[in-house]
Design a protein with these regions (language model features):
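An aromatic- and glycine-enriched ligand-binding surface/loop that stacks and positions planar moieties
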Residues: 11-91, 195, 203-204, 219-331
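Short coil/turn and helix-start
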Residues: 134-138, 174, 239-243
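Short linear capping/connector segments at secondary-structure termini
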Residues: 20-23, 137-143, 176-183
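Bacterial N-terminal signal peptides
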Residues: 1-7
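Short, well-structured active-site flanking segments
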Residues: 15-17, 166-177, 245-246
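Conserved, well-structured interaction surfaces
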Residues: 35, 43-49, 80-169, 185, ...
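Conserved beta-strand positions that form and line the central face of beta-propeller blades
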Residues: 9, 27, 173, 185
Length: 331
């Protein structure tokens, strides 16, 4: 009797519905919900959780402020170079500035975690928007056409994170929408093979994505796809051992020929709060003081660059963090 009671209790505990909100099954039943899930994929580049600058984080066990996607990407890309240095002594920062980081560096771990948070949630979205899945759910032809566009955007965002993985880490674990769900050890893909996969993925979606003039602000367009390809081709010799400079020129020319972009007449305008009007930005990660609050992103880049002898109000801020500086070599 005891054994039977335990068995029944356990069975019920394994068959629970979320106490709050919808289950993923319920979410993906309704075609109108997909744009909200897509928004979450984009938000992964700008937000660190569900409650503004902190609270209900996407990644547990790590500070939401310093682990925000753009903040850690900038730290890894710029602090080891002549572009910038940070005067803070927070754990991990001096090592980045002195080119003495290791796999244990908190910013290296944060970047890796952000990348491999973005990729799996994109995989789920891509799987749920497969033609087979949409047909099984009974979505109309019009709904399926719209969701195919969303799927292309999700594939772009996944390719972007894989590009960061390839650029920063080299040989990395590889998972896609066909990978099993649950805990398993994914196979590692070689850097050159990942380059080829990203290239193939981007070329497969470039004509599905909207043109730059038609794409809503902050959403991936054909030009964003071309820009990422050009960026990859520029350093192809590093990633694969074979240069692709002509391909870089070809895809850069596609952006120019599109006619939607040009260098801003005022360079400073590219970095201002109203830079959504700038003709220079091809793919923005959107930040807003009300709706996308974070201690990373542009909040970090601006506040951390304001020193003690600078007037923060000149830069539209209430205070400065007195951290980031450029180096004499760069000047």
């Amino acid at each position: 009797i005891i054994s039977l009671t335990i068995s029944i209790s356990c069975s019920k505990r394994l068959d629970l519905e979320p106490a709050i909100g919808l289950s993923s099954i319920d979410v993906y039943k309704d075609a109108d919900n997909y744009v909200n899930v897509l928004a979450k994929l984009y938000a992964g580049m700008s937000l660190s959780g569900l409650h503004g600058p902190s609270g209900n984080p996407d990644i547990a066990g790590i500070d939401e402020g310093f682990s925000q996607y753009i903040r850690v990407l900038w730290n890894l890309q710029d602090l080891p170079t002549d572009n910038a240095i940070c005067r803070w002594n927070d754990v991990g920062i001096p090592e980045m500035c002195k080119m003495e980081w290791s796999a244990d560096n908190s910013f290296v771990k944060a970047m890796y975690s952000r990348i491999y948070y973005q990729i799996p949630i994109a995989n789920v979205f891509i799987k749920e928007t497969s033609d087979e899945s949409m047909t099984e759910k009974g979505f109309s032809n019009e709904e399926q056409e719209e969701l195919r566009m969303y799927r292309a955007e999700a594939r772009f965002l996944r390719a972007l994170s894989y590009y960061h993985a390839m650029d920063l880490f080299g040989n990395v674990p590889f998972v896609d929408e066909t990978s099993p769900i649950g805990v398993f050890l994914p196979e590692q893909i070689q850097r050159a093979d990942l380059f080829s996969w990203i290239e193939s993925e981007l070329k497969a979606i470039e004509n599905i994505l909207l043109t730059a003039s038609a794409a809503p602000y902050g959403r991936a367009s054909q030009s964003a796809c071309h820009a990422l390809l050009a960026k990859m081709f520029l350093n192809a010799e590093v990633y694969t051992g074979t240069e692709k400079n002509q391909d870089c020129i070809t895809y850069s020319q596609k952006i120019i020929d599109n006619g939607s972009f040009s260098l801003d007449d005022q360079y400073a305008h590219v970095f201002m709060a109203d830079n959504h009007t700038s003709p220079e930005i091809i793919f923005p990660v959107v930040f807003d003081g009300q709706y996308t609050q974070t201690w990373g992103g542009t909040t970090f880049l601006i506040c951390a660059s304001i020193g003690s002898l600078m007037d923060a109000s000149d830069y539209g801020m209430n205070n400065g963090w007195n951290g980031i500086r450029t180096t004499p070599t760069f000047v």
